[in-house]
Curated annotation (Swiss-Prot):
Localization: Cell membrane; Cytoplasm, Cytosol
Binding-site residues, ATP: L251, G252, A253, G254, Q255, F256, G257, E258, V259, K273
List of catalytic residues: D364
InterPro entries reported in the protein's UniProt record: Kinase-like_dom_sf, Lck_SH2, Lck_SH3, Non-receptor_tyrosine_kinases, Prot_kinase_dom, Protein_kinase_ATP_BS, Ser-Thr/Tyr_kinase_cat_dom, SH2
Protein name: Proto-oncogene tyrosine-protein kinase LCK
Organism encoding this protein: Rattus norvegicus
Lipidation (S-palmitoyl cysteine): C3, C5
Modified residues (Phosphothreonine): T159
Cross-link annotation Glycyl lysine isopeptide (Lys-Gly) (interchain with G-Cter in ubiquitin), location: K99, K276
GO CC, one annotated term: immunological synapse
Modified residues (Phosphotyrosine): Y192, Y394, Y505
Domain Protein kinase: from-to ranges: 245-498
Residue segments, region Interaction with PTPRH: 154-242
Length: 509
């Protein structure tokens, strides 16, 4: 008999199992016919997994070798095309375009960093997600395209060198959910979820739980589905000629212009905001745009390029589902449960926490300025633009175009905009989310809203709004700006709104 010593003993899961006195790990007789791991020599093996024969170890690949996760068609002067599965050697790693050489053709050029993964790592595996938080794992697995049993393995947020398994499941009370399992490490380099069975590598673990649930909530069906990433913007293309853009479909029109889906240079799908002539100074816009392009975060719409001659064009990443206020009214938006709605709010708070950290101000935070991707990821748009608008109907603050119902009292009365006035607006945005896009202060005109706010009035709790969420709204609507919470606080509360009292991980099977 023998054992494999683990640095993570879990004695309470080992009833009715003989264990080693030193390490408390299961001891299995050589002639055991149970489904426990089989010891051969010094190895513990899974009877449900077919192991590869004993082969000499492969020569380790060099650290600068990558494998293409997707094919790439060159579209710029100096970039390098390649096919999915092709190996490349990285020559220079800087920014979002890396200089590389194809081992297939020998050609050199620049490649998009997000189309490749390190060859000598887990990164090329479709089920492995390197830098993914527990919350984002849930968002990915619950996104359209994934089903019961979809799964991924991610790096542990708290323990370097450890991993977690996240699996999509169905709960009778909660509906579609994601369950998480800690993957524990053995001293000999192996892994286990349940101490009943260990694996020499993560590939073996995945293969086993694909064949049988063996104590998990369900069998693993297929890796979490993700879309081919959008290539990074070519860094030298900032002020671009108007003729490089082809406007294809008008997505909407607002008070200051139109938004179009279009293509840049015939190959890159983008959103183009065309501003009405005279709505802002081109020089002031360019100065602000140069600041805006430095604000890069996964929860902010990426600003790609500008056309600075009037009519001004703002070229950004394209978001398939358009504005949040419109999406919430669609059949897909109406079906969203309160958990998903609050997750959207948490994503917006995360983006605003970054803006807060950068000492920036949005000035026009509302659901119309939040965009939604096809995987229901929310991103903040139009940050900073409001201060440049030169339309009298807007700058007068009482004018017809000014968003009174979203604006903090000190900004309405004195023109004082701070990150705390953005917090007030976020509280209003929360009402839009839980009412699926209803206009705030229903039945009130703008002058009535101003008069009522001066008397201390606050919007009543919307139908189907949890009491705890309404409490959060009321914190955002404190009269004194300094009494309102930070966006970092709002993000933390919304992130854990339904999970604060639940265990983050499933017990060992």
């Amino acid at each position: 008999m023998g054992c494999v010593c683990s640095s993570n003993p879990e004695d309470d899961w080992m009833e009715n199992i003989d264990v080693c006195e030193n390490c408390h790990y299961p001891i299995v007789p050589l002639d055991s016919k149970s489904t426990l791991p089989i010891r051969t020599g010094s190895e513990v093996r899974d009877p449900l997994v077919t192991y590869e024969g004993s082969l000499p170890p492969a020569s380790p690949l060099q650290d600068n070798l990558v494998i293409a996760l997707h094919s790439y068609e060159p579209s710029h002067d100096g970039d390098l095309g390649f096919e999915k599965g092709e190996q490349l050697r990285i020559l220079e790693q800087s920014g979002e375009w890396w200089k590389a050489q194809s081992l297939t053709t020998g050609q050199e050029g620049f490649i998009p960093f997000n189309f490749v993964a390190k060859a000598n790592s887990l990164e090329p595996e479709p089920w492995f997600f390197k830098n993914l938080s527990r919350k984002d794992a849930e968002r990915q697995l619950l996104a359209p395209g994934n089903t019961h049993g979809s799964f991924l393995i991610r790096e542990s947020e708290s323990t370097a060198g450890s991993f977690s398994l996240s699996v999509r499941d169905f709960d009778q009370n909660q509906g579609e959910v994601v369950k998480h399992y800690k993957i524990r490490n053995l001293d000999n380099g192996g892994f286990y979820i349940s101490p009943r069975i260990t694996f020499p590598g993560l590939h073996d673990l995945v293969r086993h739980y694909t064949n049988a649930s063996d104590g998990l909530c369900t069998k693993l069906s297929r890796p979490c589905q993700t879309q081919k990433p959008q290539k990074p913007w070519w860094e030298d293309e900032w002020e671009v000629p108007r003729e490089t853009l082809k406007l294809v479909e008008r997505l909407g029109a607002g008070q200051f212009g139109e938004v179009w889906m279009g293509y840049y240079n015939g190959h890159t799908k983008v959103a183009v905001k065309s501003l009405k002539q005279g709505s802002m100074s081109p020089d002031a816009f360019l100065a602000e745009a140069n600041l805006m392009k430095q604000l890069q975060h996964p929860r902010l719409v990426r600003l790609y390029a500008v056309v600075t001659q009037e009519p001004i064009y703002i070229i950004t990443e394209y978001m398939e589902n358009g504005s949040l206020v419109d999406f919430l009214k669609t059949p897909s938006g109406i079906k969203l449960n309160v958990n998903k709605l609050l997750d959207m709010a948490a994503q917006i708070a995360e983006g605003m926490a970054f803006i807060e950290e950068q000492n920036y101000i949005h000035r026009d935070l509302r659901a119309a300025n939040i965009l939604v991707s096809d995987t229901l990821s929310c991103k903040i748009a139009d940050f900073g633009l409001a201060r440049l608008i030169e339309d009298n109907e807007y700058t007068a603050r009482e004018g017809a175009k000014f968003p009174i119902k979203w604006t903090a009292p000190e900004a309405i009365n004195y023109g004082t905009f701070t990150i705390k006035s953005d917090v007030w607006s976020f509280g209003i945005l929360l009402t839009e989310i839980v009412t699926h896009g209803r206009i705030p202060y229903p039945g009130m005109t703008n002058p009535e809203v101003i008069q009522n706010l001066e008397k201390g009035y606050r919007m009543v709790r919307p139908d189907n709004c949890p009491e705890e969420l309404y409490h959060l709204m009321m914190l955002c609507w404190k009269e004194r700006p300094e009494d309102r919470p930070t966006f970092d606080y709002l993000r933390s509360v919304l992130d854990d709104f339904f999970t604060a009292t639940e265990g983050q991980y499933q017990p060992q099977p």
